[in-house]
C-alpha cells in the first residue's frame, strides 16, 4: 500500500472539487484524523468502576456562579416601572437642602411654582425609591427561599463542614446563623458562621468576629487539616485583619493586579519563587488573606440549601427529553458522544522506566491525553503527568477523596428523604383544605398510576394517620408514634417468656404509649405542664396548660 499523503489529497480536492475519493483513501484519512488510534488487539480485560465526580463538581460550580449572579443582578436591577428621571442617589436630600438655603439667603420666600416643582421632583424620587425597594425586597425573599440555607425551611445545607479544624463546628454548622454571631471566642464564632448567610450581620459583629479571628487563629486554622488545599468556609466568609508581621509582604504582593495574580497562581501550584520567599515559607497564612476578596466573601455568604440541588436534579430528570431536544437545537454538541475507553497496554507500575518509555514512544501518535490507571485504586481522569501527580497526592491524603465520595453517596440518600417530606407536607395541606381522599381513589391509583415516580414514598399508615388527624402534622406524628408503641407492645406480649431486658422495655413502652395518648389532648397553641401535688402523703399528677409563644 502506497504511503498516504494528506497534503497531496488536499491539493487535488482543491484543484478539482468534483474528484471522487475511493473508500480505501477515506479509510486511511479517517485513521489519520481519528485521535483514538488503536495499536493492537488485546484479549485481556480490565475491570474498573467509574463515577463522574467532575460532572457533579461542574454542577456545583454552575450553581455557585448562578447564585452569585442573581444576587448581584438584584442589587443592580431597577424595576422598569420605577426607573427614576433623576439618577443621583442624594438628589432628595440635596433638594431639601436647596429649599432651606433659598429661605435663609433671600428675604422673599421662593415662588410657589418653584417650590412645587422641587417638591414634585422630591416626591417622585421618594415614590420611585419606595417602589424599587418593595420590588427588590419581594425578589430577595424569593431568592433566599431557594438559594440561601435556612434551617427553619430546608432539610440540610449544601455546605460540607470541615469539622477537623474547629471542635464545635460539627455540632453547630447545620443549624446556626451568623446574624447572632456576637461571641468573641474564635472556636464558637467559627462554628456559628459556617452554614449561613451573613448579609444582615451588623458591622460591630463582623468587626468583632474578624478581629478576634485574626488575633487568635494560627496558620493551621487557615486551612482544612484534612484537605490543606481548601480554605475553610468560616475563614472565607470573614473580613480578615492582616497580621502585622505579614502586612509589608501583603502590600507588596497586592500593589498591582499582576503581582496579585502571580502570587495567587504560585499558591495554587506551590511553585518556588525567590521574590516571594516569605509567602512560600508560610503559604497557609497568606492564601486565605489573598483570596479573601469582596467577590469571594460575597459568593461564600450565600449558601444554598441541599433542597435546591435535589429539586434542580429532579427537574432535569423529569424533563430530560425536552431539555435534550432544546439543547440540541441551541448548541452544536451531541449528547451521544460521551466517554470512550481504549486500553493500550499493561505494564508493571513499579517499573517507572517502562511507564515513561511507553508514554514517550507513542505521545506523538496519540492526539488525546494519556491517563495511567493504577489497578485496585481509584483513578482520576486527567493528563498523564498531572494524573500521576494528583494520584500520588490523593492516595497519600485519601481523606480528601473519601470526603468527596461520601458526599456523593450522601447526596443520593438525602434526595429521597427531601422528596418524601415535601410530599408529606403537601398531602397534609391537601387534607386540611379538601378533606381525606375518596374511598375509591386508592384503587384508581393502583390501577392507572402504576408507573408513578413517587409511589411508595408515603406508607399506608402515614396516609391513614394524616387523614385521622385532618391534616394536622403534629397529631399525625403522634398517631404514628402510638401505632409504633402498640405494635411493639403486641410483639412483646406475644412472647411466652420475657427476659429482664424485654420486661423493662415493655414497661417503658407502655409509659410512652400512655404519655402519647395524653399528648393528643394538648391543643396546638399550648404547652402541657405536669405538676405533682402532695395529697395525704401521696403524689398525684395534675396537668396544666400554658399559652405557647408562636
From Swiss-Prot:
Sequence repeats lie at residues 161-164, 165-168, 169-172, 173-176, 177-180, 181-184, 185-188, 189-192, 193-196, 197-200, 201-204, 205-208, 209-212, 213-216, 217-220. Residues 161-220 are annotated as: 15 X 4 AA tandem repeats of [CNG]-[AEITV]-[DNS]-[MST]. Keywords: Host cytoplasm, Late protein, Repeat. The keyword Ion transport does not apply. GO terms for cellular component: host cell cytoplasm. Its main location: host cell. It is found in: Host cytoplasm. Induction: Expressed in the late phase of the viral replicative cycle. The keyword Membrane does not apply. Plays an essential role in the assembly of the icosahedral capsid of the virus. Allows the assembly of 3 molecules of hexon protein p72 and formation of a thermostable trimer. Belongs to the asfivirus B602L family. This is Protein B602L. It comes from African swine fever virus (isolate Warthog/Namibia/Wart80/1980) (ASFV). The lineage of its organism: Viruses, Varidnaviria, Bamfordvirae, Nucleocytoviricota, Pokkesviricetes.
Amino acid at each position: 500500500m502506497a504511503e498516504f499523503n494528506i497534503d497531496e489529497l488536499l491539493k487535488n480536492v482543491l484543484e478539482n472539487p468534483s474528484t471522487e475519493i475511493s473508500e480505501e483513501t477515506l479509510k486511511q484519512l479517517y485513521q489519520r484524523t481519528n485521535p483514538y488510534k488503536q495499536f493492537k488487539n488485546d484479549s485481556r480485560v480490565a475491570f474498573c468502576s467509574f463515577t463522574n465526580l467532575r460532572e457533579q463538581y461542574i454542577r456545583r460550580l454552575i450553581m455557585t456562579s448562578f447564585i452569585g449572579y442573581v444576587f448581584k443582578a438584584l442589587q443592580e436591577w431597577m424595576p422598569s416601572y420605577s426607573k427614576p428621571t433623576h439618577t443621583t442617589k442624594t438628589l432628595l436630600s440635596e433638594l431639601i437642602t436647596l429649599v432651606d438655603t433659598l429661605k435663609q439667603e433671600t428675604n422673599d420666600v421662593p415662588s410657589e411654582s418653584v417650590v412645587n416643582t422641587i417638591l414634585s421632583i422630591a416626591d417622585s424620587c421618594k415614590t420611585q425609591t419606595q417602589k424599587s425597594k418593595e420590588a427588590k425586597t419581594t425578589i430577595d425573599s424569593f431568592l433566599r427561599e431557594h438559594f440561601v440555607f435556612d434551617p427553619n425551611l430546608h432539610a440540610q445545607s449544601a455546605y460540607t463542614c470541615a469539622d477537623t479544624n474547629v471542635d464545635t463546628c460539627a455540632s453547630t454548622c447545620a443549624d446556626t446563623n451568623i446574624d447572632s454571631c456576637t461571641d468573641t471566642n474564635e472556636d464558637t464564632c467559627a462554628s456559628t458562621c459556617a452554614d449561613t448567610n451573613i448579609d444582615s450581620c451588623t458591622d460591630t459583629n463582623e468587626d468583632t468576629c474578624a478581629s478576634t479571628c485574626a488575633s487568635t487563629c494560627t496558620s493551621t486554622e487557615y486551612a482544612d487539616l484534612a484537605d490543606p488545599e481548601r480554605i475553610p468556609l468560616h475563614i472565607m466568609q470573614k473580613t480578615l485583619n492582616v497580621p502585622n508581621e505579614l502586612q509589608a509582604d501583603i502590600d507588596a504582593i497586592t500593589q498591582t493586579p499582576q503581582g496579585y495574580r502571580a502570587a495567587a497562581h504560585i499558591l495554587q501550584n506551590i511553585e518556588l519563587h525567590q521574590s516571594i520567599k516569605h509567602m512560600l515559607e508560610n503559604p497557609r497564612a497568606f492564601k486565605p488573606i489573598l483570596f479573601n476578596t469582596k467577590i469571594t466573601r460575597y459568593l461564600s455568604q450565600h449558601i444554598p440549601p441541599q433542597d435546591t440541588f435535589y429539586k434542580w436534579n429532579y427537574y432535569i430528570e423529569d424533563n430530560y427529553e425536552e431539555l435534550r431536544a432544546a439543547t440540541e437545537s441551541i448548541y452544536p454538541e451531541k449528547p451521544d458522544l460521551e466517554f470512550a475507553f481504549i486500553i493500550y497496554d499493561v505494564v508493571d507500575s513499579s517499573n517507572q522506566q517502562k511507564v515513561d518509555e511507553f508514554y514517550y514512544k507513542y505521545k506523538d501518535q496519540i492526539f488525546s491525553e494519556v491517563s495511567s490507571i493504577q489497578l485496585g485504586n481509584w483513578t482520576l481522569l486527567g493528563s498523564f503527568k498531572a494524573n500521576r501527580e494528583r494520584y500520588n497526592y490523593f492516595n497519600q491524603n485519601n481523606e480528601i477523596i473519601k470526603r468527596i465520595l461520601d458526599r456523593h453517596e450522601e447526596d443520593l440518600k438525602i434526595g429521597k428523604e427531601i422528596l418524601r417530606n415535601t410530599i408529606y407536607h403537601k398531602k397534609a395541606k391537601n387534607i386540611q383544605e379538601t378533606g381525606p381522599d375518596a374511598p375509591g381513589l386508592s384503587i384508581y391509583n393502583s390501577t392507572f398510576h402504576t408507573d408513578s415516580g413517587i409511589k411508595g414514598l408515603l406508607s399506608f399508615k402515614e396516609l391513614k394517620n394524616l387523614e385521622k388527624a385532618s391534616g394536622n402534622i403534629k397529631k399525625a406524628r403522634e398517631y404514628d408514634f402510638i401505632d409504633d408503641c402498640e405494635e411493639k407492645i403486641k410483639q412483646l406480649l406475644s412472647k411466652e417468656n420475657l427476659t429482664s431486658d424485654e420486661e423493662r422495655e415493655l414497661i417503658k413502652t407502655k409509659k410512652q404509649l400512655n404519655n402519647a395518648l395524653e399528648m393528643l389532648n394538648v391543643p396546638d397553641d399550648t404547652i402541657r405542664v405536669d405538676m405533682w401535688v402532695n395529697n395525704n402523703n401521696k403524689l398525684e399528677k395534675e396537668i396544666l396548660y400554658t399559652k405557647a409563644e408562636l
